[in-house]
Amino acid sequence: MSFLPVTRGEALKRGWDELDIVFVTGDAYVDHPAFGVPLLARWLEFHGFRVGIIPQPDWRSCEPFMALGRPRLFFAVSSGAMDSMVAHYTPARKLRHDDAYTPGNRHGARPNRATIVYTSRLKEAYRDVPVVIGGIEASLRRFAHYDYWEDKVRRSLLLDAKADLLVHGMGERPILELARRVRTGEPFQAIADIRGTAVVLGRGAAPPAGVVELPPFEEVAADRHRYAEAFRLLSREQNPHCAHPLVQRHGDRTLLCNPPAYPLEEAELDSVYALPFQRAPHPSHGEPIPAYEQIRASVTTHRGCFGGCSFCAITHHQGKVIQSRSERSVLAEVERMAAMAWFRGSVSDVGGPTANMYGVHCGNTRGGHACRRESCLYPSPCRYLAVGGERGAALLRAVRGVRGVRNVAVSSGIRYDLMERQPAYFRELVAHHVGGLLKVAPEHMVARVTDLMRKPGKESFDRFLERFRRESARLGKKQYIIPYLMSGHPGCTLDDMVELALFLKRAGLRVEQVQDFTPTPGTLSTCMYHTGLDPFAGAPVHVPRGDREKRLQKALLLWHLPTERRNVLDALRACGRESVARELLGGAAGGGGGRSGSGFRPGRT
């Protein structure tokens, strides 16, 4: 099986003189299941549709968008694996100089607001062909939303792009149903009821019964309290089994967002990952693609995440229901990968959004179908959560046993609070899959901040460190924790960052990289950033907005770097904590210092 066509010549080699669906994407074409557009294109091909891909077209004219001709059914547009504004700009709104999804890691292969620009060019080229938008950019901007880069509330992307339909969440079910219905002759503009899609109703059209109406665009754009109310309402409608359709008026137009698509069953997910991917970039891409190099030896075991972290949009995109592949499916993919010429024995990752959620499910099916919690872990783990861990541990053992596999890493991150209830997975992980360094993401240690983040607190982290230390010592392994920490999150003050810096110093930990909070579309944290409110409690939240405060917060986590000493002293003066300067900036603490960039040493917690 060959790559899907990117030119008319390649389509003709398949005997296709006309395509049914043409995808346009802001990423390079990598025929691998970790890349969304190729996955959906292969899925449609499997179901009998003729599909092509136009990767990273030059948007300065409409000609590159005509490379595969006029599709019979519709165009499908995605900005790529990332929101195009997130891909282009740093948290300080400075232009990035690289792009991991582009050959040669070059910046500039896609435009800002790629979904809008691509749709505009397609309408210029083929005005009468429907355009469907999807992917992370469209999904998380489907309602009126705060845009950090313009510092204002923008309309639904469906209206701004002037597209015909928006797919939100994982797209296999909605795009297949749409394609089948259009193929049978149903008028595109009459289709407004597919789960996992949003449409703009015709002027005067009545929304379906049972909808939840969000505050209109004009109100959320002008009133932060109405914005917070809209976020609170839509957050309750993420469970596909009990969600209502949502409507939001934009002037005289009405956005109708249908409930999320139902999760794929295990057999369906297995069939997706059994599709004939080449597991390589299209030959037209002559230079290495960093994102592919990073994931080419990885295996996705499941989708979804029920952690519900405030700054993460997975719940609003993939959903909180864990959709796990069968062990047989995962092993078959590892075997195919191990047979490839480039494979050298190392599987770089076996996981998903959160590695140790594989096989975890709700033990109360009836209650789970009516549940409106965004997080199954915060403020405390749900009593119905069937966490097990044995299935995940057994899968790791089986992957290690595949012929040709010498090393297996788990690099997609873990929830250490969940792993307290997964002894089998914990033992398997520490014994065979750490490789000396284990990445975890406590993000902060001050309770007020971790509560707003919906993360476990310091006590949970301390328990995990002690457990990790004991198990590593028992195994005779020198292994370290790499904690990922965040500055500038809503609710976090300079005083909170001083406490976090002191914790790091006393623990003998030094970090070299800090994630500065970026308000990305669709998250609870972004709602708090824009409104200065907790939308669920209604309480005011401190928001670090100015460049100075953000710079000083970040500097406190890098207290050990000589280049940050002046910023650290400025931060201590700004919050009246000069008294801790000697402890923070003086000699080593924590009994022997810290290993730069490596995290905690077992035995020195």
Curated annotation (Swiss-Prot):
Co-factor: note: Binds 1 [4Fe-4S] cluster. The cluster is coordinated with 3 cysteines and an exchangeable S-adenosyl-L-methionine.
UniProt-annotated binding residues for [4Fe-4S] cluster: C305, C309, C312
Family according to the record: Belongs to the UPF0313 family.
InterPro entries with a match to the protein in the record: Elp3/MiaA/NifB-like_rSAM, Methylthiotransferase_CS, rSAM, rSAM_horseshoe, UPF0313, UPF0313_C, UPF0313_N
Cofactor(s) demanded: [4Fe-4S] cluster
Ranges where the record places region Disordered: 586-605
Name this protein carries in UniProt: UPF0313 protein GSU2873
Annotated TM spans: none
PANTHER family: UPF0313 PROTEIN YGIQ (PTHR32331:SF0)
A molecular-function term among this protein's GO annotations: iron ion binding
One Pfam family recorded for the sequence: Radical_SAM
HAMAP family from the UniProt entry: UPF0313
NCBIfam families noted in UniProt: SAM_YgiQ
Domain Radical SAM core span(s) in chain numbering: 291-561
Keyword hit for Metal-binding: yes
Keyword Lipoprotein: no
Biased composition (Gly residues): 587-597
Keywords annotated in UniProt: 4Fe-4S, Iron, Iron-sulfur, Metal-binding, S-adenosyl-L-methionine
